[in-house]
Design a protein with these regions (language model features):
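Bacterial N-terminal signal peptides that target proteins for export
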Residues: 5-24
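Bacterial N-terminal signal peptides
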Residues: 22-33
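Juxtacatalytic substrate-recognition/specificity segment
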Residues: 248-364
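Ligand-binding face of N-terminal immunoglobulin V-set domains in extracellular IgSF glycoproteins
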Residues: 84-101, 105
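N-terminal, polar/Ser/Thr-rich
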Residues: 36-82
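A surface-exposed beta-strand-loop module
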Residues: 104-166, 224-225
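Extended, low-hydrophobicity, Ser/Thr/Pro/Gly-biased non-transmembrane segments
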Residues: 86, 149-244
Length: 417
């Protein structure tokens, strides 16, 4: 503690007369340093998000992955993950090969074995887009079973993304290397990357693979957990789990599996979520065609914690939790009521997510948001009539003189006609 007129050394000497003060200060400094070094949320990825060192790695000639599997056990109380991964590799080169895998920087790798024999491995200091590179040398044998164990906290280079790496009894999301180490330089076999994923979670949680596959319960345990299993065919993968409510809806020639958090159930029912999904799917499929990312039969609509707007893939699409708050559903700029705001957000499955059309130029009168507003207007006009649609979707954008407002709300970049 600095003392007036005594300088740093004099102040230290006077403060040291009470020993607990400098000891407490030193302890606090040590705790600050330890907290910074052990920060579980932030990795040290290359800040250049366009870097593609890992993505552009040359594949190994003569090495292929025939099958892989993972057994994952998140600890929802501590917010950590433990798992075992196995890779069935075919090495036709007759030589030892170095296999590279992407691992989340927060995991510790251990017990790496090839055909049951422990082998050396190394993890790179360089990190890129939430991954470090794990390198292992597999033997010259033609058939190699590579197994390893991993565990820790999956770090994130975007720590401000709420829910991005949440691991709790209500919600979790494990993406790619956070789910299991991802093969970087091994090509798929003739059948692709067939994979079996098992995950053990509290019984109240529902497991939702972000793909066309469905997870099923294969075991129930005495400690109040269940083991889920699903099959997929890709090098990585994304898995959501949480306390979800599932509604099955027939619309647009598809079976829609609509998943949303149980805490939003009252809001969803009051907003007529199921009816909104049905109206949007029927209208948009009839006027614009099928979704670009459906599998032709089923589509999962999954409400995430927060994903900055959502995204879509093979047979699944993500909806942002923020879209379904009472505040957003009451936004008059997106509709005349909660049900219409719900329609607006669902229309983004067609206009948005980077699937249905190229990004518009800065001078284009249309955008994903503009097309969504216009489509919402057309759906509401069909459901409730032209007068209602004009009142809530045209007149509100006009001033008292009947002309368009100079600065309409940013939610809509077009004027319905």
């Amino acid at each position: 503690i600095r003392r007036y007129g005594r300088g740093p050394l004099g102040s230290l000497a006077r403060t040291a007369r009470r020993v607990y003060r400098p000891l407490l200060a030193a302890a606090l400094l040590l705790c600050c340093g330890w907290s910074c070094a052990a920060q579980p949320f932030i990795d040290h990825s290359n800040p250049d998000l366009s870097a593609m060192t890992f993505l552009t790695m040359e594949p190994l000639e003569g090495v292929a992955c025939l099958r892989r599997s993972a057994q994952v056990t998140p600890d929802t109380r501590r917010g950590t993950v433990a798992g075992t991964a196995s890779y069935q590799l075919q090495n036709t080169t007759g030589q030892e090969q170095t296999v590279a895998l992407g691992v989340t920087p927060g995991y510790t790798i251990s017990n790496v074995r090839a055909n049951g024999v422990e082998i050396p491995f190394s993890v790179s200091d360089y990190q890129e887009y939430n991954e470090a590179k794990l390198e292992v040398a597999i033997p010259a044998e033609e058939q190699v079973e590579l197994t390893l164990e991993y565990g820790g906290f999956p770090q994130e280079d975007l720590p401000t993304m709420q829910g991005g790496k949440e691991l709790s009894g209500e919600y979790l999301c494990l993406e790619n290397a956070a789910l299991s180490p991802r093969l970087m330089n091994v090509m798929p076999g003739e059948d692709g990357y067939p994979a079996t994923i098992e995950i053990t979670l509290p019984a109240a949680m529902t497991v939702i693979p972000f793909c066309a596959s469905e997870a099923e319960v294969v075991a129930e345990h005495g400690d109040g957990t269940k083991t889920w299993r699903y099959e997929t065919n890709r090098a990585g993968g994304i898995l959501y789990a949480g306390d979800y409510v599932r509604e099955e809806i027939q619309a647009g020639g598809l079976t829609i599996d609509f998943y949303y958090g149980r805490k939003h159930q009252a809001v969803m029912e009051a907003a007529g979520a199921a009816e909104a999904v049905r109206a949007v799917m029927d209208y948009c499929a009839g006027h614009y065609g099928s979704l670009a990312f459906g599998d032709g039969e089923r589509l999962k609509l999954i409400q995430s914690r927060v994903a900055g707007g959502g995204y879509a893939g093979d047979g699944a699409s993500l909806l942002d939790e923020a879209d379904f708050t009472a505040h957003n559903l009451g936004d008059a700029g997106k509709g005349g009521g909660a049900a219409e705001v719900m329609i607006h957000e669902l229309v983004h499955q067609w206009w948005g997510l980077g699937n249905m059309f190229d990004t518009s130029g800065p001078d284009s009168p249309w955008s994903a948001e503009g097309l969504t507003c216009y489509t919402t207007y057309r759906i509401v006009k069909e459901l409730y009539g032209g007068d209602y649609a004009r009142e809530h979707y045209v007149d509100q954008w006009r001033g008292e003189d009947g002309k368009p407002k100079e600065e309409p709300p940013a939610v809509c970049s077009c004027t319905a006609k």
